[in-house]
Amino acid sequence: MTVEQREASRLGPLFDSCRAENRAALIGYLPTGYPDVNTSVRAMTELVESGCDIVEVGVPYSDPGMDGPTIQRATEAALSGGVRVRDALTAVESISKAGGRAVVMTYWNPVLRYGGDAFARDLAAAGGHGLITPDLIPDEAQQWLAASDAHGLDRIFLVAPSSTPERLANTVAASRGFVYAASTMGVTGARDAVSNAAPDLVARVKAVSDIPVGVGLGVRSREQAAEIGRYADGVIVGSALVSALGDGLPSLRSLTEELAAGVRQRKSP
């Protein structure tokens, strides 16, 4: 039996639109402050202009346990440059003004230091749609569940191939907007082959809920984006975009346009 997602979702209309167009959404991640704050904000608006449906605004953190080497290096550079949590909120505001949809992706500690309710308030005021919390599980998220409800934000939790049926069901039930399915075990990073565990993980989520599922951790090409877009509602790209940004904004735009074309290849019926 599947559970229908009844709570209003800020990202719901986007996924409805993508479904009507028979395609997946492109979800792109960049860390705030890399290579500097102003360039990172410009890069995020480039994502919007190049066909990215949702921008994940990363909050650099000093102990990024789930990030691969590309994102870790970018995070270290951003922290060395003095990036702050408020800079991420500025990025969200710029994305919103550019006509895009922004969610913040952060480990929980920076939000805890900022104040959960205050962060939710300021994120909503900046035009943000929600928050991805890779190291926060619903069982320990009472503060965030209350704050996201109070300010109407989506809350995106992670599931993995190792998630037990009970943990997966509980995580999906607590999520709103979409569920982040980690398609490979371990840290993030672009890979030549996308994990074959991803379709099975998406199917497990679909068996218990109609909430959209975004698949991440490994996408780097149009072909991989099209492959995942055949069974997932969202294709999440991080490390490949960070690498492209390291080569400059034109490289970032080119890759984003390529990935956007991939998710727009017609999905199988």
Swiss-Prot record:
Q: Which InterPro entries match?
A: Aldolase_TIM, RibuloseP-bd_barrel, Trp_synthase_alpha_AS, Trp_synthase_suA
Output one GO MF annotation: tryptophan synthase activity
Q: Which CDD domains match?
A: Tryptophan_synthase_alpha (cd04724)
Q: Which Enzyme Commission numbers does its entry carry?
A: 4.2.1.20
Q: Which PROSITE patterns has this protein been placed in?
A: TRP_SYNTHASE_ALPHA
A GO CC annotation recorded here is:
cytosol
- Look up keyword Amino-acid biosynthesis and say if it applies: yes
Matches recorded under Pfam families: Trp_syntA
Indicate the residues that form the catalytic site: E56 (proton acceptor), D67 (proton acceptor)
Catalytic activity as recorded in UniProt = (1S,2R)-1-C-(indol-3-yl)glycerol 3-phosphate + L-serine = D-glyceraldehyde 3-phosphate + L-tryptophan + H2O
User: Which of UniProt's keywords are assigned here?
Assistant: Amino-acid biosynthesis, Aromatic amino acid biosynthesis, Lyase, Tryptophan biosynthesis
Q: According to its UniProt record, in which pathway does this protein act?
A: Amino-acid biosynthesis; L-tryptophan biosynthesis; L-tryptophan from chorismate: step 5/5
Top-rank EC class of the record's enzyme? lyase
Keyword Lipoprotein included in the entry's annotation: no
**Subunit and interaction comment:** Tetramer of two alpha and two beta chains.
Give the protein's function: The alpha subunit is responsible for the aldol cleavage of indoleglycerol phosphate to indole and glyceraldehyde 3-phosphate.
Family indicated by similarity: Belongs to the TrpA family.
Listed name of the protein: Tryptophan synthase alpha chain
Q: Which species is listed as the source?
A: Mycobacterium ulcerans (strain Agy99)
| Gene that encodes the chain | trpA
